[in-house]
Regions:
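Surface-exposed, low-hydrophobicity beta-strand/loop segments enriched in small/polar/acidic residues
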Residues: 1-145
């Protein structure tokens, strides 16, 4: 299901979402936050974040960015739900703990806030802004030394 952002089964309710204008061109699957009433890329995972959704209702795919100044929709992450998100370039192993940097999920390091885990069956190299599955953690935490 690489063509969707929320990867839940049909028997679960779709996560709550927020609809706002974007302050920049934003690809679906990137982590965003609300700043001055518009969606902006989440700089870190130390913020209240959302996951940008594709505008399927007008026929756009996960590869179509929401242009700056246009209305976009973003999901509020739900613990244990799976999302298809954008990653920083690296190789990720199943269960790898992830944080946010510039809207992308990346391997969390000491002192960062962990928000999700890599939830694919095997390790995989992902290019910058490539999509991959994550499971949202029930409780975020600061990665210890």
């Amino acid at each position: 299901m690489a063509n969707v952002i929320w990867r839940g089964p049909v028997h679960l309710a779709q996560p709550d979402s927020r609809t706002l204008k974007t302050g920049a061109s934003i690809l679906p699957g990137l982590a965003v936050t609300v700043t001055a009433g518009v969606f902006q890329l989440a700089a870190t995972s130390k913020v209240d974040y959302f996951i940008m959704h594709n505008r399927a209702y007008i026929g756009e795919t996960v590869d179509t960015a929401v242009p700056s100044g246009e209305t976009g929709e973003a999901f509020k992450p739900v613990p244990q739900y799976e999302f298809n998100v954008r990653f920083a370039a690296a190789t990720y192993a199943p269960g790898a703990v992830l944080s946010i940097a510039s809207g992308q999920l990346k391997a969390a390091v000491t002192g960062e806030v962990a928000v999700a885990v890599f939830d694919e069956a095997a390790s995989r190299a992902i290019s910058a802004n490539g999509l991959g599955d994550v499971r949202i953690l029930a409780n975020s935490y600061v990665v210890p030394a």
